[in-house]
Amino acid sequence: MQKITFDKSLCVRCGQCTLVCPSRIHQRQTSKDYPACVKGAEEMCIACYHCVAACPVGGLSVNGRGHDDCLEFDKTAAIRFEQIAHLIRKRRSIRHYSGAPLEDRMIEQLLDVVRWAPTAKNGLPVKWVIVNSASKVRELAGVVMNWLKTQPNTSPMVEVWDKGGDPVFRGAPCVIGAYTDDTTSHWSAMDTAIAVETFDLCATAMRLGTCWAGTFVRAAQSAEKSVIHQWLGLSETETIHGGLMVGHIGEEVYQRIPYRPEASKMWIR
């Protein structure tokens, strides 16, 4: 159970904390009242810290974390819709990498931002395994290929591998796996997809190349997944729901944004 603490000496009774609480844990009867937790409702707190972030005076805390634990808005860094739209449109799945190693600090920067990717009920179930070594990525690709060779219609990929190529990770120097413990969340796949794509877009903004590692994820979710789990150090209850190749972009250069058809829409009014 979360512990919510109000400081009446600071509270200005603006009502913002009660307004933003998704679980309606704390309420006021009138505008003159101080906010207070509904009896027994603290068990429903999802520790989203919306109330703390909305308070203009730092008048409350959750689990001892208050005003100073929430980042300030950078009002000079306002992002226009056109900038976000351009980032999404220009993002490409990159399958040719420069061969240069990827610095750990860049991965750390990206994962630091991805902490704020939305998750169902603020469950924050997504964990990450980072394979950041060309030799280890190649080794993992070999484990995936052992599974792939048992699957139908994969002979073209097997042929590429046998000739020294990498049809699994395309020669990327780094592979990111996103996983959850499926005993703790019903929304694992969706939460992971959101987190991975957040990472993906942020990596694009850092001028890194990325590509979703679908073959790796298929293998990691297959009946023979135990071999991959053992290699990655995952338990039986943990599942890889998303994977990305990441690296500095090689010779793959685009002059324009590829065509996409109009969105299929159905309006109900």
Regions found by a protein language model. Give the residues of each.
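Acidic, surface-exposed loops and disordered segments
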Residues: 1-269
